[in-house]
C-alpha cells in the first residue's frame, strides 16, 4: 500500500502534502472534484485576479521609446536621445547603461519632465557601452527599447582630430593671406605698366609734334649754305 502511494520507498514531502490535501473528505452531499486533488477555490480566484491585473497594467503602460540614438560622442561623455508616440502621455524616463560583457549596471531615472534626451557622463575612453531607454507614465514604465551599442573614442584620437581641424583652419587663413598679397602685387604691377605706357605715349606725342619744326629749320639752314650772297648784295662772279 505504501509503495502504491509514493512509489518505491518512503514518499517525499510533496507526496505527503498531496496525500493530506487529497485525504480531506468533503462534507456530506458534496461531490468529489475530478482527479486526485483539485485546487482550492481561493487560490484559483487569486491567480485569475492576478492575471487580469497584470493584463490591465500591460495595456495601460506606455510603449517602448523609438529612434534611440547616441550623439555628441566624446571620450568621457555622450548624449542619448529618443522619441515617443504622440498619443501617449509620458512624465519621465529611465535609462540603463552598462559596459559590454560586464554585469555592472548604471540606472538613471527622472520624472516630471518632457525631455527626450539625457547626458551620460564618467564614461571610459575606447570602451563599448549598451543603453536601454524606458518611458514612464502614471500607469508605470514601458518595456525597454531596443539596445543601442556605442563605443567611446580615444582621447588621443579626439585631440588629433581637433589639432587637424585647427591646422586646417590655419592653413586656410595663410592661403587666404597669400592670395590677397598676390592679388595686391598683380594690381600694383598692372598700375606700373599702365603708367609706363601712358608716359611713353605722352613722350611720343611730344616728339611727333616737334618733328615738323625741326624739318623747317633743317631746310632753312640748307638753303642758306647753298646760295651765299655778296656783301654788297650781288652775286659773286668769277673772272675769266
UniProtKB/Swiss-Prot annotation:
Task: Give the span(s) annotated as Disordered.
Answer: 1-33, 210-240
- Where is the motif named Microbody targeting signal mapped on this chain? 238-240
Glycosylation site list: 67, 112
Biased composition, Basic and acidic residues: where in the chain?
11-24, 210-221
Residues annotated as transmembrane: 181-201
Q: Does the keyword Thylakoid apply?
A: no
Q: Please indicate which residues carry the site annotation Required for dimerization.
A: 106
GO terms, molecular function = hormone activity
A biological process term (GO) from this entry: positive regulation of brown fat cell differentiation
What name does this protein carry? Answer: Fibronectin type III domain-containing protein 5
- Tissue specificity as recorded in UniProt: In adult, it is highly expressed in skeletal muscle, heart and brain.
Q: One GO cellular component from the entry?
A: endoplasmic reticulum
The free-text domain note is: Fibronectin type-III domain is capable of forming a continuous intersubunit beta-sheet dimer; dimerization may thereby play a role in cell-cell adhesion or signaling.
- Inducing stimuli: Up-regulated by muscular exercise. This effect can be mediated, at least partly, by PPARGC1A.
- Cysteine disulfide links: none
- Give the UniProt keywords, A-Z: Cell membrane, Glycoprotein, Hormone, Membrane, Peroxisome, Secreted, Transmembrane, Transmembrane helix
Where along the chain is composition biased (Gly residues)?
1-10, 231-240
PTM note says: The extracellular domain is cleaved and released from the cell membrane.
Domain (Fibronectin type-III) spans: 64-155
Amino acid at each position: 500500500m505504501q509503495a502504491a502511494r509514493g512509489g518505491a520507498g518512503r514518499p517525499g514531502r510533496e507526496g505527503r502534502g498531496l496525500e493530506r490535501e487529497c485525504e480531506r473528505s468533503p462534507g456530506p452531499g458534496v461531490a468529489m472534484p475530478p482527479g486526485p486533488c483539485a485546487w482550492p477555490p481561493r487560490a484559483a480566484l487569486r491567480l485569475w485576479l492576478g492575471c487580469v491585473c497584470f493584463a490591465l497594467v500591460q495595456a495601460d503602460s506606455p510603449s517602448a521609446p523609438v529612434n534611440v540614438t547616441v550623439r555628441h560622442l566624446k571620450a568621457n561623455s555622450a548624449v542619448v536621445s529618443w522619441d515617443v508616440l504622440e498619443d501617449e502621455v509620458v512624465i519621465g524616463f529611465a535609462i540603463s547603461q552598462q559596459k559590454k560583457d560586464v554585469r555592472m549596471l548604471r540606472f538613471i531615472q527622472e520624472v516630471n519632465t518632457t525631455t527626450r534626451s539625457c547626458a551620460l557622463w564618467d564614461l571610459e575612453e575606447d570602451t563599448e557601452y549598451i543603453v536601454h531607454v524606458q518611458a514612464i507614465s502614471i500607469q508605470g514604465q514601458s518595456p525597454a527599447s531596443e539596445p543601442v551599442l556605442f563605443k567611446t573614442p580615444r582621447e588621443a584620437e579626439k585631440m588629433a582630430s581637433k589639432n587637424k581641424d585647427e591646422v586646417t583652419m590655419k592653413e586656410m587663413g595663410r592661403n587666404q593671406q597669400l592670395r590677397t598679397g598676390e592679388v595686391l602685387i598683380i594690381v600694383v604691377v598692372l598700375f606700373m605698366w599702365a603708367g609706363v605706357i601712358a608716359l611713353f605715349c605722352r613722350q611720343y606725342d611730344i616728339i611727333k609734334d616737334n618733328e615738323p619744326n625741326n624739318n623747317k629749320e633743317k631746310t632753312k639752314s640748307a638753303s642758306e649754305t647753298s646760295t651765299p650772297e655778296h656783301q654788297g648784295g650781288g652775286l659773286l662772279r668769277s673772272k675769266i
